[in-house]
Amino acid sequence: MIIRSPEPEVKILVDRDHIKTSFEEWARPGHFSRTIAKGPETTTWIWNLHADAHDFDSHTSDLEEISRKVFSAHFGQLSIIFLWLSGMYFHGARFSNYEAWLSDPTHIGPSAQVVWPIVGQEILNGDVGGGFRGIQITSGFFQLWRASGITSELQLYCTAIGALIFAALMLFAGWFHYHKAAPKLAWFQDVESMLNHHLAGLLGLGSLSWAGHQVHVSLPINQFLNAGVDPKEIPLPHEFILNRDLLAQLYPSFAEGATPFFTLNWSKYADFLTFRGGLDPVTGGLWLTDTAHHHLAIAILFLIAGHMYRTNWGIGHGLKDILEAHKGPFTGQGHKGLYEILTTSWHAQLSLNLAMLGSLTIVVAHHMYAMPPYPYLATDYGTQLSLFTHHMWIGGFLIVGAAAHAAIFMVRDYDPTTRYNDLLDRVLRHRDAIISHLNWACIFLGFHSFGLYIHNDTMSALGRPQDMFSDTAIQLQPVFAQWIQNTHALAPGATAPGATASTSLTWGGGDLVAVGGKVALLPIPLGTADFLVHHIHAFTIHVTVLILLKGVLFARSSRLIPDKANLGFRFPCDGPGRGGTCQVSAWDHVFLGLFWMYNSISVVIFHFSWKMQSDVWGSISDQGVVTHITGGNFAQSSITINGWLRDFLWAQASQVIQSYGSSLSAYGLFFLGAHFVWAFSLMFLFSGRGYWQELIESIVWAHNKLKVAPATQPRALSIVQGRAVGVTHYLLGGIATTWAFFLARIIAVG
């Protein structure tokens, strides 16, 4: 008798021809909702249409159908990203001075947009050097392209076409995986398989292929560019890939092929996989051989990580087991039940992902200046400032989004009957202690951090500089930060073998890298001024967290409104009969949190902008004397509120205010217009619904008199709609104002 092991069953994980493709739905706005599909009776209809179009939870309660819609929408999102990317590369190919910039990146500025001569707008085409007139761009694409080894506009053109093809492919995939082969719920919930594929596939093989590209294409091309070879003389990428001898001339170990790899003699490869630390003095960017090494190491880590979870082959970890084993002495059931939450509530899953991604984006913002990854990025001050500001804003929005979806999870997906004594339940049960302590911390930080500034303003006003908190009077040195800096500055010899410099020049150690007479990076000194503003950062961040966390922890119930869960995620007040219950919905906490997020990030980018202009960015003479843009005034000026207003906001706004008649004048107009958008928001935030409804009735009366009254009844915005419109214009106006202020300033002086 032969005993065979049972054949593994092949599970069918898709439904074929799940929903027929039809354009008829497109002709019926609001087809996803019975009420909205009826068409407009009042103007509120258009608001509801926009609010619910992508709220898939409101279309159906079937988790499988919701999952499929989200999955399909992701492909649409990817398609838009590829389309955008294609546009960026197309502008580089068609309208830019990329080839000229490549030949002389220190004297020529990057530009990829030339304004047509209509009503005199061609004034915006500034002279960026090399005889090219256009708008100076600050996105960092030129530096990225050089690091990738792109040497001609034709290559950019081909890449743009490739991205368009991918965009079309993504659109097709979105349609295919909803209409033709829609995955079943089991497929979406198979987390081990998902982790294996995302870790080993996306991150592992993704990093490996990038490392391969860096080694075989980017490194040799950049080596030629750094040596001053004309880009047109450099061999094409495929020649390096196909002809090993060509690479061996630059990196001798290539002649030995894979032998050192299999004989474990890996140090042979140290000519193109390095561990130097610091910056390349020619380009002011990280050593590209360091970054190739980094991506190879990351690839190996993720390829291993992608083989850790149990799928069809009965070996490896199961995520449920891992989570349920997480029990501490004070955490009751620990993470029991978390697996079920994360596989049945996409809001809970999204919330975690947004929190992680938001934090990571802010980490990216800081690394982009401290460890500038691309050639000639560090000396392009406009791009440095833009990249920092951009990643800070994006990170802030993602973190607020994390709180929003955590609250939606609490309202829509949390089932208190099945959750007892797990970590989340325990947090909810002592939420009063958490929130009241956090509130105390906010009050303490607010009064003390602001109090230090007010003290300084008062002493300064009374002419008593010796009694101020400053580096020259009463010092409040950030000793812990200085200790961390010092540790890192001394670390290279003791940690990585062969590392000649620390991970970042900002740590200290006296090294300075300048490219073409401009400072790329140098050790950043920290003093009393930084100590003060860092406590403002602590204050604003804690208040943001207080608002957002309160919204999540009290999303379902509170002492004021015990049945809050029944009212939903967003509601204006708890009915007409109960005063003092407005702005308590989870949505309102997100709304209020956005303002404090805006506060937090504004202080951060102001701090960064001024600190870099004062202590880092500037020019260096032949004698090695550094002249900073604002001459090191941060340490003495930023210790008073008056100093921030006078020497930062007012002094540095002169470029944007005086930009009329120059190529920077668009920023002057934006500065004006964005202030207007910001002020416009206050109209929505400070006036109530009744005021507008009264006004509307009067206007409708006039229309009736003239027999031009519309069939759709005009309605004032609801309370929630007014707040949404208000906060949108507030943030948009504020961010665009800052953008115009920063860019006009840094393009003029940088």
UniProtKB/Swiss-Prot annotation:
The root-end lineage is:
Eukaryota, Viridiplantae, Streptophyta, Embryophyta, Tracheophyta
Q: Answer yes or no on keyword Membrane.
A: yes
What UniProt keywords are attached to this protein's entry? 4Fe-4S, Chlorophyll, Chloroplast, Chromophore, Electron transport, Iron, Iron-sulfur, Magnesium, Membrane, Metal-binding, Oxidoreductase, Photosynthesis, Photosystem I, Plastid, Thylakoid, Transmembrane, Transmembrane helix, Transport
As recorded in UniProt, its EC number(s) are 1.97.1.12
Does the entry feature the keyword Kinase, yes or no? no
Where, by residue number, does phylloquinone bind?
Answer: W692
Tell me the function of this protein.
PsaA and PsaB bind P700, the primary electron donor of photosystem I (PSI), as well as the electron acceptors A0, A1 and FX. PSI is a plastocyanin-ferredoxin oxidoreductase, converting photonic excitation into a charge separation, which transfers an electron from the donor P700 chlorophyll pair to the spectroscopically characterized acceptors A0, A1, FX, FA and FB in turn. Oxidized P700 is reduced on the lumenal side of the thylakoid membrane by plastocyanin.
* Membrane topology classification: Multi-pass membrane protein
Q: What class of enzyme is it?
A: oxidoreductase
Q: Which SUPFAM superfamilies match?
A: Photosystem I subunits PsaA/PsaB
Q: What is this protein called?
A: Photosystem I P700 chlorophyll a apoprotein A1
